[in-house]
Amino acid sequence: LWFDMITDQTHSQLISNNMDLMGLNKFLHTHYDSNMFDRFKFKFDGLETIEKNYSQAYQDMFTLSVLQGKRNGTYLEIGSADPYYGSNTALLEEFEWNGVSVEIDKELVERFKNARSNEVICSDATTLDYNEILSRISDENNVVDYLQLDCDPPEITYQVTKMIPFDKYKFRVITFEHDRWYSGDHIYNESRKLFTDLGYVRLVPNIAPDNRQDYEDWYVHPELVYPEVIEKMKITQGKIHKSEDYMIETKNKKGYGDFS
């Protein structure tokens, strides 16, 4: 199993047991390793230093690609879950990013505190003062590099999204989990309208770790990301997009771009 590579044996077994209890597919995560370097479509500064990533569907690699390997970035991660397995920010922390993670599960929060350097808040995400949190991590222009929105169920994710002061703060990259594959079109459609109205560009729609279970949209702010990056990385088709096919070159296919 992939998570055997990123954690100790005891923690790995605990993850495996919990996933069995929840009926989850332990092989559904797609990941990058250094053997894929030559086939990685959107190369960025520092890619050569990465042995492996952690996200379920390349969200960490996508963020670094959009921001061209940025060091010392910032993030707000709402719904952090495990500190490494499936984490969208563990790799960013290795790139010296600073951020705040929010997680309601006390056991996961304790694991996070023991394993990671950045701040984690144990709380119901619908009860927090996001203006206060963002004031601590945003730059002088009230910009944060990455926002992850991933609560369960997606109705909670959307509720939290409405609590974030987008009128004051902007984000270079946003990943929003709508879980359309099992929750239907309501949150899927409402979230798309919200982010479009806020001026964000949906760079990659209907992302999935496989070819069936579309569960996320990926956005960027056009004022905060280079236009040539948007042009090279944007997908306009509405079908489901397998994350590995989007990020990794396969034989006889031409890549979307190279930012090295």
Q: What is the role of each PLM region?
A:
Residues F42-K52, E119, V143-D152:
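Acidic/glycine-enriched edge-of-secondary-structure segments
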Residues T49-I50, S80, H178-S183:
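Short histidine/acidic/glycine/proline-rich micro-motifs that form metal-
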Residues W2-N72, Y84:
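Class I SAM-dependent methyltransferase Rossmann-like catalytic core
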Residues L67, R116, I137, I164-P165:
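Active-site catalytic pocket residues across diverse enzymes, especially alpha/beta-hydrolases
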Residues L64, N131, S135, Y158-K162:
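Amphipathic, non-transmembrane alpha-helical secondary structure
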Residues T74, T89-N98, R111, D139-L149, ...:
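Conserved acidic-Pro-Pro-aromatic motif
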Residues I50-N131:
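SAM cofactor-binding core of SAM-dependent methyltransferases
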